[in-house]
Amino acid sequence: SKSSSPCFGGKLDRIGSYSGLGCNSRK
């Protein structure tokens, strides 16, 4: 959930999954 790298953030996404695992989920 970071502007630098959407794939890597370490923060919990809205769905509760890590940003690193929700690479495609963000788009």
Curated annotation (Swiss-Prot):
Molecular function in Gene Ontology: hormone activity
Keyword terms, alphabetized: Disulfide bond, Hormone, Secreted, Vasoactive
Biological processes annotated in GO: blood vessel diameter maintenance; cGMP biosynthetic process; receptor guanylyl cyclase signaling pathway
Disulfide bonds: C7-C23
Family under the similarity heading: Belongs to the natriuretic peptide family.
Biological function: Hormone playing a key role in cardiovascular homeostasis through regulation of natriuresis, diuresis, and vasodilation. Has a cGMP-stimulating activity.
The protein's name: Natriuretic peptides A
Encoding gene, per UniProt annotation: nppa
